Every structure is written in C-alpha cells, then in structure tokens.
A protein has these predicted regions:
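Glycine-rich phosphate-binding loops of nucleotide-dependent enzymes
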Residues: 1-200
Length: 200
C-alpha cells in the first residue's frame, strides 16, 4: 500500500497475531520476511523502536492515557520524550523545552501533577507527543476502544490534527464498526495477509 502525507489508512485485523506482526515490523521487533517498506523513497529497516522513531514512525498504543504517560514527569516533559531522539542535547537546552511549553499553551496543565489530571487531558498529551515531533507516519492501535463518548471525540480530533500536520496515520482496529465511522482507505489483515476492501 501507499500512504501519502496526511492520509489515513484503516486496517481491520481479525487475529491478534497478525496485528502484533504488523506493529512489530514497523517497531523493529520482527524482521520483514517478504517485500520491503519505503518511507519517503528511503528503504525502512530498523531493529528497535528508538530507531523506528528516528526514521519517522510514531506509535500510539491502545488507551495511551494509561500506557504512554509517565506520571512522574510534567506535561511538557511527557510530550518532549520522543524529541530527545531527534534533537541532540534536547534536555540540556531550555529553548527546546520552552518551545514545547509554548506549543501546549496551557501553563496550568504543566503545573499540575499528572496523577491529578483527567483521562481526557492525558489522552491529548499522548497524541501531542507526535504533533510536536512530526514523524512521517503514526501507527495507532485500537484508538476507539474507550466507551466514553467525550474520549472518542477527543481521539477523533487528535487524529485529525495529526493529518493536518501532514502526518500519515495508520489505524489498527479489531472493531469492524469503526471502519465506516472515520474517513480513509480501508484494508483488512487476516492470517498475516493484507488485502484491500474489494478483495475481502
């Protein structure tokens, strides 16, 4: 498949093993047995997630407000985590962390301990990591599993914000109903084989 800047691709997977293999091919945890991946016309070959991030791929796990936020760090520090892979000496230059704080535009949020912040704000922070970093692609695992309507709407808006920044978005979902609720090309992943909608 081809994914252009700002486009969204929805992939419905029918088995957990296929989803894990797809994710791990991009994160470097699993080698590619057939075919090749190119990002911006450059062969994509990585051996770990840190290298994947440096090569322009971001990752958002299921329920990121629980799994991707470090409550012993400030909001600015959380959003800045991927940037230290991109900018040498990031943590030692105040101008960099200040620019992230300016991006967040929420001094009150940065003063609070993250354990005292609601899930909706934490969800936004998890996505804002990649808005600041601006990778070429972000792969999102089951973005709409939360049953809370407000949380789903925030997630939808944050995915749209990624697209507006020119970031390609790949959604991996086990919820077939989601396929018709968000715009974008659809593909299906079953037993390790990726097919287009008309071939399903």
């Amino acid at each position: 498949f081809t994914l252009c800047s700002g486009e969204l691709l929805k992939i419905y997977y029918s088995d957990e093993k296929s989803k894990s293999s797809f994710w791990e091919m991009f994160s470097g945890e699993e080698s590619i047995e057939e075919g090749q991946i190119y990002i911006s016309e450059k062969l994509y070959k990585v051996s770990n997630m840190s290298q994947a991030v440096r090569e322009g791929v971001g990752f958002i796990t299921e329920a990121p407000y629980r799994s991707m936020i470090l409550d012993n760090m400030s909001a600015t520090e959380n959003v800045s985590v991927p940037l230290h892979e991109k900018v040498r000496g990031f943590w030692f230059a105040k101008k960099y962390t200040r620019s992230v704080s300016d991006f967040l535009q929420n001094d009150e949020l940065n003063k609070k301990k993250l354990k005292n912040i609601g899930n909706a704000e934490l969800q936004k922070l998890a996505y804002e990591k990649w808005l600041v970093y601006q990778p070429k692609i972000v792969i999102i695992e089951n973005p709409f599993t939360d049953m809370d309507i407000n949380m789903r709407e925030i997630t939808r808006k944050m995915i749209g914000a990624l697209q507006k920044r020119g970031i390609g978005v790949i959604l991996l979902t086990a919820n077939f109903a989601i396929m018709n609720k968000i715009k974008g090309e659809s593909m299906f992943l079953k037993h390790g084989v990726l097919t287009r909608e008309e071939e399903w």
